[in-house]
Amino acid sequence: TFTITNPENYSGLYLPLAGEEGLKSSITPTLGGDSKTDQNHFLLEPVSIENLHNNRGTRNFWCRVEGKGYWSACGVSAEQEFDKYTDRQDESTLEAGMMWQKLTRTSKKYDLQSEITSFVSIDGTTEIQLIKITNLSEEEQEVTPIVAIPVYGRSADNIRDHRHVTSLLHRIDTKECGVEVTPVLSFD
């Protein structure tokens, strides 16, 4: 394993997550990247090294802190981007090993700490983020967790199709432990 302080300050840094059943993901210290089983089955939008760190449509976990605002546990809010490389930047640490990573982020402004551990399940069919939020304030805070992961749910061949139209051609069913995406029509 290895550890890096403020990993979001290193350009081009990303790691693999993979399982034995074919799920392959790339993940950055801010949870950017993609997830797929092959070139025809992407859960998240396909990315290249050029847009790996610039794509905003990716895994995210937000905390709405009553009376204070919104904080991204991944470090990608506009406020966090603005504070990067200043003394207001969140303290963050990336610890990683073979096919997993743990991102720890601390916000002085919001008095919160997040710990996000990312890996693929042993059976290799599910990408998992275990998220722990700790209140560092002396006082009780009302925090509402918000998960935001835009599902691409189609082939890399569809990357240039009109996104709104192709997303309308999906049937999405909410399940107890996630969502199921079924394309009903695709363009060739």
Where are these regions (language model features)?
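Anionic coordination/interaction segments
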Residues: 1-188
